[in-house]
């Protein structure tokens, strides 16, 4: 049963990768296999680090407290994602090149947050291909929302290694699928209607563990 929770959580925190890949595919941009591996490694590394932090926190609280806390963290993150989806339309950005993945203003994170808000900005050299440092920045940008979920997952007792591998595989898979889908589909508005799924999955997993 825990493996089901791990797969669902990995799915929830990796769906943004599909959205970004889809956006790039529509613009006929390319992400080489090596760059996809870099993105996967970044996603897995961020998840692993966040879960180590979560595991460290479990040493200071009783088991029954950590179980509730982990569930509440996932519910909270999921609720935030749903808020971003359902908030008034006037506050949203609908331009393709400014497809918003996370409405969060943290100036200290600079370019990472900028990439989250405008995925096309990850192509720093405007070459139409995501490579090198661009892949690293994109990988970390896609992992920001997974950081809190990783802490919650560790508190719930999930394996950091298994969870990190699952997220790495899911994120690379969804980026690849998104790019291919974007190449073949000219209409993309339907994908916006699915943006609530990560939040719903996180809330479901969190409530399941409460």
Curated annotation (Swiss-Prot):
Recorded topology in the membrane: Multi-pass membrane protein
GO biological process: intracellular manganese ion homeostasis; manganese ion export across plasma membrane; sporulation resulting in formation of a cellular spore
GO cellular component: plasma membrane
Cellular location(s): Cell membrane
Superkingdom per UniProt: Bacteria
Keywords: Cell membrane, Membrane, Sporulation, Transmembrane, Transmembrane helix
A Pfam entry, by short name: Mntp
InterPro entries: Mntp/YtaF, Spore_YtaF
A GO molecular function held by the record: manganese ion transmembrane transporter activity
Disruption phenotype: Disruption of the gene causes a 10-fold reduction in the efficiency of sporulation. Mutants divide asymmetrically but fail to complete engulfment of the forespore by the mother cell.
Induction annotation: Expression is regulated by the sporulation transcription factor sigma E.
Regions that span the bilayer: 6-26, 36-56, 69-89, 129-149, 162-184, 190-210
Main location: membrane
Full protein name: Probable sporulation protein YtaF
Organism: Bacillus subtilis (strain 168)
